[in-house]
Amino acid sequence: MNAWEVNFDGLVGLTHHYAGLSFGNEASTRHRFQVSNPRLAAKQGLLKMKKLAGAGFPQAVIPPHERPFIPVLRQLGFSGSDEQVLEKVARQAPHWLSSVSSASPMWVANAATIAPSADTLDGKVHLTVANLNNKFHRSLEAPVTESLLKAIFNDEEKFSVHSALPQVALLGDEGAANHNRLGGHYGEPGMQIFVYGREEGNDTRPSRYPARQTREASEAVARLNQVNPQQVIFAQQNPDVIDQGVFHNDVIAVSNRQVLFCHQQAFARQSQLLANLRARVNGFMAIEVPATQVSVSDAVSTYLFNSQLLSRDDGSMVLVLPQECREHAGVWRYLNELLAADNPISELKVFDLRESMANGGGPACLRLRVVLTEEERRAVNPAVMMNDTLFNALNDWVDRYYRDRLTAADLADPQLLREGREALDTLTQLLDLGSVYPFQREGGGNG
C-alpha cells in the first residue's frame, strides 16, 4: 500500500529562553542565561517547514504549549491570582519559573513514539505519548501533548493515541528520539528499533550523564503501540557516548527506509546489531561514520546526526542539516565525501536553526515522523498540514504575538502570560483544534 512519511514539526513557543535546564545536554548548559529571540526561533522553524513542504516532502505543524504553566506552580504551593503566583515564584524561587516556562515542547521528536499501521497488529496508527520524566520541565508536557495529538489525529477508527507511561524513573520514556524504523517502501512492514540507555539489573550504563530511556519503558511502548513482535529490536545506546552529551539516540543516529546513518560508536554491541539488521531488513545499508573522520564531540557540537533523512520519489535521499555542520571544516568535508560515495544520499539541505540549536535541538528534534497511507493522511486534521497559506498565516501570527528579546527576568511579567494565552487562543482557532489548553477549559479562552 502506498504511504508517505509526514513530518510534524513543533512550533517554537513564545517563552523560548536559555535556562540550562537539561543536564546531559551540553548545548543547553553552555548557553545558559543568554538572551533569546523567540520570534526568530519560531520563524527559523517555520522556514524549514515551508521549504521542505515546497520541495515535495509532506509537512505539518504541532502547536506550542501554554507557558508559563501556572497550574504546576499552584501544585508547588504558590497561591493567589495568576499574577500573584508569578510574582511570588519570581521572588521566592525563580528557578521554578524558568522550568514552568520552558519552550521544550517544540522538540516534538520527544512528544510520542509512532507505529505505522503496516507494523501494528490491529492495522491502526498508534501514538504513545512520552512521559519525559528525567527532567522536571519536560515531565509537564504529557497531558497537553496527548490533547494536541488527539485533536490532530482525531479519527479513532484509524488512530490510537495512548497516554504516557507512569511517571517513575523505571519507565523513563523519551519518545521517537530513541526510536528508528527501517524497511523498504513506507507502506510495507518495517523493523522498529527501540533504543534504550539503561535497564534494571544491567550494570552497563553511563556514569557522568543520565540515561533517560529505559528498556522497560521501550518494551511497554512497543506493547501499547501493538507492534508485531516479529518487527521489534531493542538496542542499547553506547553508554560512553551518553557521557559525551548524546542524551538521545537522534543525536548519534538517524534512519530512513533501508538506510541507517550513524556514528561507529552509537550503539553498544554495534556490530552485532548491524548484523541482525542485515539479516532482517531487505537491502539494509549502514552508513557508519568513523571516529577518525568525525569524533563524537564534533558530532554533538554540530548535530550531524540530528539531521533528517528524507526520501524522494526516485529512491534518492536528502540529508537535512543544521548550519553548524557547514561551518565545521571536518564535518563538511566528510559530508561532501558522503555525497560522492555509493549510497542513496544525493543532496544536502542546510538550515539556520541557531535559536533551537543553542538549547540543544537540531532539525530532527523539531520533528515527529508519522508514516501515513493516503486514506490516513486524509483523516488527519487538515488545518495543520503545511502549505503556503498556512505558512503565511503562522508567520503573521508570530509577528503579531512573539517578542524578539527574552531574558529569564521577563518570565515574571504577567503581560507575557497574557500575550501567550491570547496567542494560543488564536492559534487553536487557526488550526481548528478546539480547547486543548487548560486555560481554555477553565473558561479563559474561546478555542
Swiss-Prot record:
Q: Listed GO molecular functions?
A: N-succinylarginine dihydrolase activity
Q: Which residues bind substrate?
A: 19-28, 110, 137-138, 212, 250, 359
Matching Pfam families = AstB
**What is its EC class?**
hydrolase
Q: Which organism is it from?
A: Escherichia coli O6:H1 (strain CFT073 / ATCC 700928 / UPEC)
Q: Some GO term, biological process aspect, for this entry: which one? A: arginine catabolic process to glutamate
Q: Pathway of this protein?
A: Amino-acid degradation; L-arginine degradation via AST pathway; L-glutamate and succinate from L-arginine: step 2/5
Family (UniProt): Belongs to the succinylarginine dihydrolase family.
Encoding gene (name): astB
Tell me which EC number(s) this protein carries.
3.5.3.23
Q: Name the NCBIfam families for this protein.
A: arg_catab_astB, PRK13281.1
Catalytic residues in the record: E174, H248, C365
Q: Which Gene3D superfamilies match?
A: Succinylarginine dihydrolase (3.75.10.20)
User: HAMAP family in the record, alphabetically?
Assistant: AstB
Q: How does it assemble?
A: Homodimer.
Q: Any idea what this protein is called?
A: N-succinylarginine dihydrolase
Ordered alphabetically, the record's keywords are:
Arginine metabolism, Hydrolase
Q: What catalytic activity is recorded? A: N(2)-succinyl-L-arginine + 2 H2O + 2 H(+) = N(2)-succinyl-L-ornithine + 2 NH4(+) + CO2
Q: Would I find Iron among this entry's keywords? A: no
What is this protein's function? Answer: Catalyzes the hydrolysis of N(2)-succinylarginine into N(2)-succinylornithine, ammonia and CO(2).
Keyword Hydrolase found:
yes
